[in-house]
Amino acid sequence: MTVETTEGWTLAPDIAWARIAGGQAAVMTLEAGQPLLLSASGDVIWDVLVGGRTPEDDLVADPPAPLSTTDVTVQVAEAFGLDPADVAADVHAFLEMLEAHGVLVRVRTA
């Protein structure tokens, strides 16, 4: 039996994040220590990645399950009331940017 895998994303194990005034998310790796302030649309993507958790929830919870690029794209599109095809390129670019900053890790999902 063959199990199909797809590209997915998981949070890096050494990150910290917080909500600042206005609810914006600031994320960083503990090693770099340089926070990355997310845009409003970035906040929506981040909320999908963390499963709607708060930073306080993250302190005591197991890490969120990895999500496929498709799952992230569909959930973001739903949040904005758009078709997934309309947001796919922007979502993928944002995920790759978070990966470049060490906040996300690319994985294979079943």
Where do the protein language model's features map onto the residues?
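Long, charge-rich, low-complexity alpha-helical segments
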Residues: 31-110
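Long, low-complexity, charged/polar intrinsically disordered regions in eukaryotic proteins
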Residues: 1-33
